[in-house]
UniProtKB/Swiss-Prot annotation:
Lineage: Eukaryota, Discoba, Euglenozoa, Kinetoplastea, Metakinetoplastina
Pfam families: PFK (PF00365)
Compartments, as annotated in UniProt: Glycosome
GO biological process, one term: fructose 6-phosphate metabolic process
Annotated binding of substrate, by residue: T225, I226, D227, M270, G271, R272, E323, Y378, M379, I380, R381
UniProt-recorded name of the protein: ATP-dependent 6-phosphofructokinase
Chain residues that bind ATP: G105, R171, G172, G196, D197, G198, T199
Role of this protein: Catalyzes the phosphorylation of D-fructose 6-phosphate to fructose 1,6-bisphosphate by ATP, the first committing step of glycolysis.
Length: 486
């Protein structure tokens, strides 16, 4: 597991990383010992889906390209544990208290997850109580724990109709010992952490602290990342809703651009290090002409040439840009937010200024050129989930309760190859999933957007030359250092 943290995985899709770096131990979920309590649901007696035996799916079942066979099959021997309801439980339902905490930025589906965890615990397992901790991990601190609320069926029955989170949220870590002390003092047996990679890294510290002698606490993560960049997962809740809402923004930008003489519409979307929302919105809308994502860095000159090419073809241009693109275009203020995320420069505003300046410089060629800028990010994050995302949230939360009651801990619930699986938190937070520039999604983007393959290739070659030059400089420095020691 430790070798993964030394991998340089930035901008490299997780599935392209060598399988030799992922071991069976990395994907093995810890379970608290002993399952002596019977599931209170009578359905487990006859229903096959209530099982104690853990089933698995292959980590990567896709056919391997290097196999010379008429029907190639996967040679990957690594497996992931399938999530399911269990016949026997680790925790005695009538004596079990469940805790829920939501952290980080809001996202469509948070209330759905809170609702489903609460109702599954109360109705299916008849647990003693469900407690909601307010405003992120602060709610687990000694001071914040005073604001905790007990959740009932009536409290959560209708919350899925609204965006945001009824528990509130915040960024930033808290002392793990203090948080576990709160869980022990309030007699919480299972803590569900709903949040992104920063939240789950915090959950990992709670999980490690909860291992201290005499404690019997399960820590279970429900991952929330609207960017859809979670490792070992092909889908995270809120992502599909975000794409649907983002398409509306692109359509508005298109309406503005097409109504003007040489109109340019710019839409900035979420995506700090992964451009899944921008890429899928570009394909789904079929009205964006340029897609800019962090995985495909381009200089200002190339972007301006892309705009020029589009305006020459048609008197309008729509640009979709992910917030993490072009962070080298201007020097940022530096620093990090409370969650440890690097503060980004506002690429949407910068791009707008650059395009306006370029249009002024080319006024004779593109008279009356106008730029319209739309940033729908906070509107997207705050809306309730689509019906498909709501269903997904319910499935994730329900299975999370089933597995946690059976003693699964230190893991998250996710979807991979259309199966709900369990992944250890340490593995899930060790690498970020990004858009593959050689994959089908980016191929679709390239097919429907304007391109300057020669310019992009030239830029990539220049970047490679700069990298090689830096390596040569470093090599000469090492040789000189060694020579001085002789």
């Amino acid at each position: 597991m430790e070798t993964r943290h030394h991998l340089n995985t930035k901008m490299v899709p997780s599935y392209q990383a060598p399988l030799s770096k992922v071991t069976a131990a990395d994907l093995t979920v810890e379970r608290l010992p002993g399952c002596k309590y019977m599931n209170p649901s009578k359905k487990h007696i006859l229903r096959e889906e209530y099982r104690d035996k853990v089933k698995h799916i292959m980590y990567d079942p896709r056919p391997q390209e290097d196999l010379d066979a008429e029907y190639p099959v996967s040679c990957n021997k690594l497996v992931c544990e399938l999530a399911a309801a269990r016949k026997h439980l680790h925790f005695n339902p009538s004596e079990t208290s469940i805790g829920i905490v939501t952290c980080g930025g809001i996202c469509p589906g948070l209330n759905d997850v809170i609702r489903s965890i609460t109702l599954t615990g109360i109705i299916s397992y008849r647990v003693k109580r469900v407690v909601g901790f307010r405003y992120g991990y602060w709610g687990l601190s000694k001071e914040g724990s005073k604001t905790a609320i007990e959740l009932s069926r009536s409290d959560v029955r209708q919350i899925h109709r609204f965006g945001g989170t009824i528990l509130g949220s915040s960024r930033g870590p808290q002392n793990p010992k203090e948080m576990v002390d709160t869980l022990v003092r309030m007699k919480i047996n299972i803590l569900f952490t709903v949040g992104g990679d920063g939240t789950q890294r915090g959950a990992l510290t709670i999980y490690e602290e909860a291992k201290r002698p005499g404690e019997n606490i399960a820590v279970f993560g429900v991952p929330k990342t609207i960017d859809n960049d979670l490792a070992f997962s092909h889908r995270t809740f809120g992502f599909q809703t975000a794409v649907e809402q983002a398409v509306n923004a692109v359509r508005a930008a298109y309406a503005e651009a097409v109504s003007l003489n040489y109109g340019v519409g710019i839409v900035k979307l979420m995506g700090r290090e992964s451009g899944f929302i921008a890429a899928q919105t570009t394909v789904a809308s079929a009205q964006a002409n340029i897609c800019l994502i962090p995985e495909n860095p381009l200089p200002k000159e190339t972007v301006m040439r892309l705009i020029e090419r589009r305006l020459q073809q048609s008197r309008n241009c729509v640009i979709v840009v992910a917030e993490g693109f072009g962070q080298d275009w201007e020097t940022g203020t530096g620093g990090h937010d409370a969650s440890g995320n690097k503060k980004l420069v506002d690429i949407g505003f910068i791009l707008k200024k650059e395009v306006e300046s370029w249009l002024r410089a080319n006024k004779e060629k593109f008279p009356q050129g106008t730029v319209k800028y739309i940033d729908p990010s906070y509107m997207i994050r705050a809306c309730p989930p689509s019906s498909n995302d709501a269903l997904f949230c319910t499935n994730l939360a329900t299975l999370a309760v089933h597995e946690a009651m059976a003693g699964a801990t230190g893991c998250i619930i996710s979807m991979r190859y259309n199966n709900y699986i369990l992944v250890p938190i340490k593995a899930a937070t060790s690498v970020r999933r990004v858009v593959s520039l050689r994959g089908a999604l980016w191929r679709q983007v390239r097919e429907i957007t304007v391109g300057l393959s020669d310019d992009v290739q030239q830029w990539n070659e220049q970047d490679l030359r700069r990298h090689l030059e830096s390596l040569n400089v470093e090599r000469e420095r090492i040789i000189a250092r060694l020579a001085s020691k002789v």
